[in-house]
Amino acid sequence: MSGSKSVSPPGYAAQTAASPAPRGGPEHRAAWGEADSRANGYPHAPGGSTRGSTKRSGGAVTPQQQQRLASRWRGGDDDEDPPLSGDDPLAGGFGFSFRSKSAWQERGGDDGGRGSRRQRRGAAGGGSTRAPPAGGSGSSAAAAAAAGGTEVRPRSVELGLEERRGKGRAAEELEPGTGIVEDGDGSEDGGSSVASGSGTGAVLSLGACCLALLQIFRSKKFPSDKLERLYQRYFFRLNQSSLTMLMAVLVLVCLVMLAFHAARPPLQIAYLAVLAAAVGVILIMAVLCNRAAFHQDHMGLACYALIAVVLAVQVVGLLLPQPRSASEGIWWTVFFIYTIYTLLPVRMRAAVLSGVLLSALHLAISLHTNSQDQFLLKQLVSNVLIFSCTNIVGVCTHYPAEVSQRQAFQETRECIQARLHSQRENQQQERLLLSVLPRHVAMEMKADINAKQEDMMFHKIYIQKHDNVSILFADIEGFTSLASQCTAQELVMTLNELFARFDKLAAENHCLRIKILGDCYYCVSGLPEARADHAHCCVEMGMDMIEAISLVREVTGVNVNMRVGIHSGRVHCGVLGLRKWQFDVWSNDVTLANHMEAGGKAGRIHITKATLNYLNGDYEVEPGCGGDRNAYLKEHSIETFLILSCTQKRKEEKAMIAKMNRQRTNSIGHNPPHWGAERPFYNHLGGNQVSKEMKRMGFEDPKDKNAQESANPEDEVDEFLGRAIDARSIDRLRSEHVRKFLLTFREPDLEKKYSKQVDDRFGAYVACASLVFLFICFVQITIVPHSLFMLSFYLSCFLLLALVVFVSVIYACVKLFPTPLQTLSRKIVRSKKNSTLVGVFTITLVFLSAFVNMFMCNSKNLVGCLAEEHNITVNQVNACHVMESAFNYSLGDEQGFCGSPQPNCNFPEYFTYSVLLSLLACSVFLQISCIGKLVLMLAIEFIYVLIVEVPGVTLFDNADLLVTANAIDFSNNGTSQCPEHATKVALKVVTPIIISVFVLALYLHAQQVESTARLDFLWKLQATEEKEEMEELQAYNRRLLHNILPKDVAAHFLARERRNDELYYQSCECVAVMFASIANFSEFYVELEANNEGVECLRLLNEIIADFDEIISEDRFRQLEKIKTIGSTYMAASGLNDSTYDKAGKTHIKAIADFAMKLMDQMKYINEHSFNNFQMKIGLNIGPVVAGVIGARKPQYDIWGNTVNVASRMDSTGVPDRIQVTTDMYQVLAANTYQLECRGVVKVKGKGEMMTYFLNGGPPLS
């Protein structure tokens, strides 16, 4: 077994309200850092150590590595508890000092180069710790890995112009085989995305770009219908708001159209009726869409009904009004097309079909009603260009917005998924953690990780004192015989099965299992919460254990029995040291309880007088005569008793309690908790059947257990997201976090985070705006007379825009270009200020190209010329005078009239339409704030309206006159009649109105886009923060667990839920085992009021063990694993896994020998500075062991085998201040020139006579 069962008095910190004890330094955080470093495959040495640690085959650790590690794991120093009360032994002249090596220093003397822990930390600057790799503890990677192949992520198709930039987070990396599929084809967008990590480049082939552009025009959806419905629910309220906004602007447009029609008589009833009906229908739909009964399924129906209304308005608006012109109705057609793309929540396919249908209707009706115009071809070509540009801009606006929304939804879902995964894993960690440590200890430790605490002279000691508890020790008598009949693996399985049963009994009897030492099991009742019936609980526990072992005896045929000893009194409980914490209890009463078990009888419960007094006569007893069987009991004159049976009164009470428990269980409506799906003594039964005796012990047949199938993680995420969508209130989020008009966050920190977001599609925005510029150029080249200025200006603008596009798109494939260009591109794209300036510059060039040719047109006033020709006043001129003019003025004549050398621009309304396109280009830049867009669009409107109304007013007046004359000529079919009713609304009146309508609609769209983006950012930020908090808690638990269990063992038990009988063990071929005990510590330990009832003695022991833990954490001892402490005995081993076992060089054996010598030196140092005379005995042995965990639900890692037993005997039979080794150990060390001497033959219990040796020193220095 793994060492002696004797438990020394030293204890655990009693932190009570009446007598709080001071806390030590922050080394427990270093302990967690070490555990996590080892978990990531990197060695760790605490920051305060300069004990000559050697580095792993690679020289010294750099200061940068030290700084990274220090900043990662040392968030701050630990807080100090309130100081000791007036009876502080340090203040009261207690006769010894309690400074460990990490804190002790000579006052004015020479420490031999050793400073205080604080000095060493300052000198080391973080210690010799090797920094872990970027990415930390790996919790995020674990969360990402949990998603596996089932996770659904949208694939980004960035308009075919740039790749998806890596965000540095696994949740944002796009993976092949996942993403958005095209609507209807059910296949994935295989080569449509270009994905790379941050800082990588990608070569975009022409075929890939074309394919990506084709994908843009196709509707996107998630492969999962359930996920797609969740996405629609996610944006339902925002879509409802967009739909309402669209209805409002459509009503406004219809009213403007009605006003224009009313301003040019004669009125047409059909036109008025259709538009009035359209307004009424839209208003009714708006009311219905904002009712509570309106839900997601109604959205599509409302959208398509609205498209039908728009198509009706389009047809009536083009067919009925007079005078007819191919340029009539372009502005509202552009408006309808663009708003369908941007404000109507429909799929891309529906939006494209609607836009094309509206364009085709306008072109067809224009061709039909204006077929006799000689200049119709130019107008139709220009109209095609305008509608094509509008559709493309609509696609370029709709697509990024939808992709952004889908990515925001998916990233939020991924955050929730990672959070739920972390939560599940954290719950598993919590269960595992709380099965090893009581809740109050574990919570205090985790709180200390977070707290920023001051550096203290002493290490933090986690200790509590409990005055009224009962301690039970139980040993299996005859276990040696049972063990001799099975292999080491079968022995571990037997222990696991038996002690799992004892753990269940302990829970039922309100006892807390403390530790398992070999075949010894001890527990305490009254911890952590006090109980008045603690003695009864321990006695009942002892009876159940004896009954359980009797059934084991029946099943196995081996004469095994339980020897139980119980004592009631006071304990100190908690953990000692910095590594591999195990909850334990210490006190003189614990020592007495241990001897009560040793002096007891098989199959009987041996109690002291103190325990008997707590039983209140509920049990019949007889004298125990423990002093006859145990020297300790005899020496201290302990009166003992043996339990005979329960009294009748106690039996009735137990029956009543059992009945109440059954009634309580039945009222809850489920079966009482059972002890898992255990298969105890499976090897002895030879099958899956559970015998009658086993059922009597409480073990259940696996077939009888109702296995609970774990929910699908994907379904759990979707269900959680659905609840969150239903619970969130967009209006509340807006009012609480976002200013109403400016749409900025109320909290400056949120605004700062939002402003730092990088929009990777900026190059696509610039490219789209440049495309608008090209369309404007083609429109004006088609409809406006050519000039040298036009050619030179457009060529200059094209070169400038091409340069801007080139620099912006470099960001998507940086490695293909020189470093200066890469730097310039990053500075533009990654800076919101720079990208906004570049966007404004691009929009300015597009706007200038829309109207600059106006200044090259004939600015003579046609009305004045006609008045002069007909000798009438200007007010008397009308369209009929144009027809009667000798100069034959017409819309198709580009020759300058009135003697002007400049050509006529007879269609100035196309300048206005070009300006409308430039406004659409403004809306493409999604990264520009809505207020910025509003200011920019108002500036464009002001400048253009000013030009129209002042220098260009004659251009528009001339066009109005010519259009009216052309319509009259067309309606009269060449006759000389001139009806006076042929009028139209002046372009100089129409232009400001339609531009204002566009500015309003584009501002509302910009506000909607930004509001959506900010709310998505806010919700994703909240989900991310919750996920990070969960991951932070998970990291705390993981570091704490790795400081309790080896990392591979912890990972095994965290992988999934384990049954109590599931066994974890591994056979190790050649392990070096060390037991190091402070031989005379029991003499030092006393419980006096002056030393806080022994707490200060335990504080010194904690300092000693902490120093040992710091030594074992050094890099040169990375092959060693601390197993546990048993009182004042320190147990360690090396070579327990492939990474620490050196079969050829035996370095793990030499490492444990060096470690043993280092402990001897450290103890001398402690004695020198604490004015004590502690004597250490160390035993070493090598050989095969079995390493494993007993109890899957309450795991305890240990090693077993003959090698462990002999190593323990080397310690117990050793000589103070010497290191005793076996012959096997001697042969390995002697071969490596270690200095040893032969002690001779030593009589070892259970082994007979053995030849042993003393280790005196390491290899001589060469």
From Swiss-Prot:
Residue intervals of the Guanylate cyclase domain: 470-597, 1072-1211
Cofactor: record remark: Binds 2 magnesium ions per subunit. Is also active with manganese (in vitro).
Compartment annotation: Cell membrane; Cell projection, Cilium
Segments in the Extracellular topological domain: 858-910
Gene Ontology BP, a term: regulation of insulin secretion involved in cellular response to glucose stimulus
Biased composition (Basic and acidic residues): 25-37, 152-172
Chief localization: membrane
Protein name: Adenylate cyclase type 5
UniProt organism field: Mus musculus (Mouse)
Gene: Adcy5
